[in-house]
């Protein structure tokens, strides 16, 4: 598996981790969730990312999750494994373990958080991870969560590494445009911002690594199809209706809102693990009205005037 496997993936879902009320992983809930995603235009699946609440998962739990999902997916779509932390040595050891585990198109490695490395420190961190195994690496650049930002210039240095095949970019559309304009041909650029997917695809991005595709994959697929067919009027009309849903899904720390919607839809997404908590009941009801029912009046009570948490 390689760049070519992922090149065809426009909608990659950053999969939640379903939990029981006691906080243990609900493995019995995973098959229905996976089939739902595949039935609604998910082209690839990211495991043990931020939406999976990876900071609260042990490596052993992540490996159990990997095995369970691989068995269910059975090669139908490419899988990406979250492999990075803010500890370079730990990241190297885990990426080696995941590479030996097998079955993944790539590993996703986040920009180191909390310890605030320099650009050179970040470059050396990702180079060391990419050098450690033959598992292709996608970099996750999300300064809203990690405080520091990998600049486009540093990203392009890393893009020359033969084992670094892409980026999940959550900075600005200006940075994304620069990367798309100057990147090597076989380097994937995904947006990690659902609300920016329309703009990113029009700039030439390869796709989106998405939370909203858990609940609104059909709309995203329809919008991307319209863009591919140069029907901008249709694509923009879908985007206008999609944005309030995205805002609702991120009106409370993620993945609490999407889990609330999935639970309402009949899937056993369960609660979040501390320190995240479920959305309050009244907020959850409003989120569901927007995301499921398209009740945009509920948007005003849910998201208007609320500073959306970074995800």
Curated annotation (Swiss-Prot):
SMART domains: DHDPS
Example of a GO biological process term: lysine biosynthetic process via diaminopimelate
Pfam name, any one: DHDPS
Pathway in which the depicted protein is active: Amino-acid biosynthesis; L-lysine biosynthesis via DAP pathway; (S)-tetrahydrodipicolinate from L-aspartate: step 3/4
Site (Part of a proton relay during catalysis): 50, 114
Active-site residues (renumbered): 140 (proton donor/acceptor), 168 (schiff-base intermediate with substrate)
MF GO annotations: 4-hydroxy-tetrahydrodipicolinate synthase activity
Listed EC numbers: 4.3.3.7
GO cellular component: cytosol
Superkingdom: Bacteria
UniProt keyword list: Amino-acid biosynthesis, Cytoplasm, Diaminopimelate biosynthesis, Lyase, Lysine biosynthesis, Schiff base
Intracellular or extracellular location(s): Cytoplasm
Keyword Methyltransferase: no
Reactions this protein catalyses: L-aspartate 4-semialdehyde + pyruvate = (2S,4S)-4-hydroxy-2,3,4,5-tetrahydrodipicolinate + H2O + H(+)
Residues annotated for pyruvate binding in this entry: 51, 209
Broad class of the protein's primary localization: cytoplasm
Family to which this protein belongs: Belongs to the DapA family.
Task performed by this protein: Catalyzes the condensation of (S)-aspartate-beta-semialdehyde [(S)-ASA] and pyruvate to 4-hydroxy-tetrahydrodipicolinate (HTPA).
Protein name per its UniProtKB record: 4-hydroxy-tetrahydrodipicolinate synthase
Gene giving rise to this polypeptide: dapA
């Amino acid at each position: 598996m390689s760049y070519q496997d992922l090149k065809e993936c426009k909608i990659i879902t950053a999969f939640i981790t379903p939990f029981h009320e006691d906080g243990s992983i609900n493995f019995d809930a995973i098959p229905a969730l996976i089939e739902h995603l595949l039935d609604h235009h998910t082209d690839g699946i990211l495991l043990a990312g931020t939406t999976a609440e990876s900071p609260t998962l042990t490596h052993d739990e992540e490996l159990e999750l990997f095995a369970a999902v691989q068995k269910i997916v059975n090669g139908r779509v490419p899988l990406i494994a979250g492999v990075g932390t803010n500890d370079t040595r730990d990241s190297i050891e885990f990426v080696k373990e995941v590479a030996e585990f097998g079955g993944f198109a790539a590993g996703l490695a986040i920009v180191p958080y909390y310890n605030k490395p320099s650009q050179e420190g970040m470059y050396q961190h990702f180079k060391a991870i990419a050098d450690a195994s033959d598992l292709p690496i996608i970099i996750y650049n999300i300064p809203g969560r990690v405080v520091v930002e990998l600049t486009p210039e540093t990203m392009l240095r890393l893009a020359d590494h033969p084992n670094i095949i892409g980026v999940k970019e959550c900075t600005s559309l200006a940075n994304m445009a620069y990367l798309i304009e100057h990147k090597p041909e076989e380097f994937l650029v995904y947006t990690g911002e659902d609300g920016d997917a329309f703009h990113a695809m029009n700039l030439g991005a390869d796709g989106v690594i998405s939370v909203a595709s858990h609940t609104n994959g059909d709309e995203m697929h329809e919008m991307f199809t319209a863009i591919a067919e140069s029907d901008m009027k249709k694509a923009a009309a879908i985007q206008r209706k999609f944005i309030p849903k995205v805002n609702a899904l991120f009106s409370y720390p993620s993945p609490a809102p999407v889990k609330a919607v999935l639970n309402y839809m009949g899937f056993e997404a369960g609660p979040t693990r501390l320190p995240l908590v479920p959305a309050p009941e009244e907020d959850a009801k409003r989120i569901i009205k927007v995301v499921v029912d398209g009740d945009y009046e509920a948007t005003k009570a849910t998201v208007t005037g609320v500073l959306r948490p970074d995800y």
